[in-house]
Amino acid sequence: MGKKSLVKLTRKTNPRIVSLILTLKERANGDSAPIWKDIAKRLEAPSRNYAAVNISKINRHTAEDDVLLIPGKVLGAGLLDHPVTIAALTFSDSAFEKITEAGGKCLSLEEIMEANPKGSGIRIFR
């Protein structure tokens, strides 16, 4: 790991994010999956730059059974009328309810890495 990456990691105070970034980078190199390196880079940025995506935007831009990865938080504004699988750093309570009511799944980033190590078929959503 380069010196610049270590400096970025030492600025992070959340131990879950630090370990997640390290795991993402290991997976990117080990599984030859550049999607995990991209997500690690986005999570190294300041948290004010993390994605905050509403359910209404997810509903407009996805089809049934899509798999999304959101490097940030999913918010509950809007309605979801089809099932989607969403992996995100965090979910608001209302977003979690709306996704599960529509028949979708809410996963953590760690869970999606285990389920799909190559990252194929995953859309990064911002």
Swiss-Prot record:
Sequence similarity: Belongs to the eukaryotic ribosomal protein eL18 family.
Any single biological process term in GO: translation
Gene Ontology cellular component annotations, sorted alphabetically: cytosolic large ribosomal subunit
Sections of the chain in a coiled coil: none
NCBIfam families: PRK04005.1 (NF003079)
InterPro entries, per database record: Ribosomal_eL18, Ribosomal_eL18/eL18-A/B/_CS, Ribosomal_eL18_arc, Ribosomal_uL15/eL18, Ribosomal_uL15/eL18_sf, Ribosomal_uL15_CS
Gene, per the UniProt record: rpl18e
Lineage: Archaea, Methanobacteriati, Methanobacteriota, Stenosarchaea group, Methanomicrobia
Entry keyword annotation includes Nucleotidyltransferase: no
Recorded superkingdom: Archaea
Protein name: Large ribosomal subunit protein eL18
HAMAP family: Ribosomal_eL18
PANTHER family for this protein: 60S RIBOSOMAL PROTEIN L18, LARGE RIBOSOMAL SUBUNIT PROTEIN EL18
Cysteine pairs bridged by disulfides in the record: none
GO molecular function terms listed in the Swiss-Prot or TrEMBL record: RNA binding; structural constituent of ribosome
Keywords per UniProt: Ribonucleoprotein, Ribosomal protein
Keyword Ribonucleoprotein: yes
